C-alpha cells in the first residue's frame, strides 16, 4: 500500500520548483460540509496540499487560495472546534502545537462525547489531529493568502493573510516573498476526488519544450 500511495501521490521525475501555488477551497469536501469554512479544518486542508506538493514547492513558496470563509463552523459535525478556535486566540497560544496540553480535557468532555456517540459528530480529539496536521502549512510556506473571505478576521485568526482579489494577493506575494517572476502552479481541481498532483505536473511536463 505504501508503494501504491507513493506512485499515486508523487511524481519523482518532477524537477521544477514552484514559488506560488493557486487553488480553491470549496465549502464541502474531505471531512464534510464546512471543511472549507471552519478555520481549523481549513488549516488541515491547506496542510494536505503541503503534504501532496512539498517536493515541488520552492523554499519561498506561497499559497493563494480562494475561500468564502464565511464563519460557517458546522457545529453539529464538529461541536468542539468553535471552542478550540476561541481558545487558540488567547492564553499565550502562538502556534497550533501550543494547544496540545488541552487534548485530554477535550477528549474526555462529556457533552462532546455524547454528540460523538449519539448525534453523528466527530470525536473531540479529532480536532487535535486536525491541528497537528494544520501546523504543517505554517511550517512549509512563506505565506498563505485567503482570497474572497466574507469573514476575513476568522482567517487572520489562524495566521493567514487576506486579500479581496487574486490580483492583490499575487502582487503582495511578489513584492514580499517571490520576486517579480515567480513560477506559478494553478490547481483548478484541487478538491476534486480525482485530483492528483501528477496529472498537472504530467501535463506541464508534456507541454514544456525539451531542453537540450
Residue spans of the language-model regions?
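Accessory "access/gating" subregions that flank catalytic or transport cores
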Residues: 1-41
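Glycine-rich phosphate/diphosphate-binding loops that line cofactor/substrate pockets in enzymes
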Residues: 14-17, 56-58, 173-181
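Structural motif
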Residues: 20-24, 64, 185-186
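Conserved small/polar residues in nucleotide/adenosyl-binding loops
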Residues: 204-210
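Generic recognition of flexible, low-complexity loop/linker segments
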Residues: 5-12, 50-54, 131-134, 171-174
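Extended hydrophobic packing segments that form well-structured cores
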Residues: 131-203
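Flexible loop/turn segments at secondary-structure boundaries
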Residues: 28-32, 71-76, 152-155, 192-195
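C-terminal catalytic subdomain
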Residues: 40-145
Amino acid at each position: 500500500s505504501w508503494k501504491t500511495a507513493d506512485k499515486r501521490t508523487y511524481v519523482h521525475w518532477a524537477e521544477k520548483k514552484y514559488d506560488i501555488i493557486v487553488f480553491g477551497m470549496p465549502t464541502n469536501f474531505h471531512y464534510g460540509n464546512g471543511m472549507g469554512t471552519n478555520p481549523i479544518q481549513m488549516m488541515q486542508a491547506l496542510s494536505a496540499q503541503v503534504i501532496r506538493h512539498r517536493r515541488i514547492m520552492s523554499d519561498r513558496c506561497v499559497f493563494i487560495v480562494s475561500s468564502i470563509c464565511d464563519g460557517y463552523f458546522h457545529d453539529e459535525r464538529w461541536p468542539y472546534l468553535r471552542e478550540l478556535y476561541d481558545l487558540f486566540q488567547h492564553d499565550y497560544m502562538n502556534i497550533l502545537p501550543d494547544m496540545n496540553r488541552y487534548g485530554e480535557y477535550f477528549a474526555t468532555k462529556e457533552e462532546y462525547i455524547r454528540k460523538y456517540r449519539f448525534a453523528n459528530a466527530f470525536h473531540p480529539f479529532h480536532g487535535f489531529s486536525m491541528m497537528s496536521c494544520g501546523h504543517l502549512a505554517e511550517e512549509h510556506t512563506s505565506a498563505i493568502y485567503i482570497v474572497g473571505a466574507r469573514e476575513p478576521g476568522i482567517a487572520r485568526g489562524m495566521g493567514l493573510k487576506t486579500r479581496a482579489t487574486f490580483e492583490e494577493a499575487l502582487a503582495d506575494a511578489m513584492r514580499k516573498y517571490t520576486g517579480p517572476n515567480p513560477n506559478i502552479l494553478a490547481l483548478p481541481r484541487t478538491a476534486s476526488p480525482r485530483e492528483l498532483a501528477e496529472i498537472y505536473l504530467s501535463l506541464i511536463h508534456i507541454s514544456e519544450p525539451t531542453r537540450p
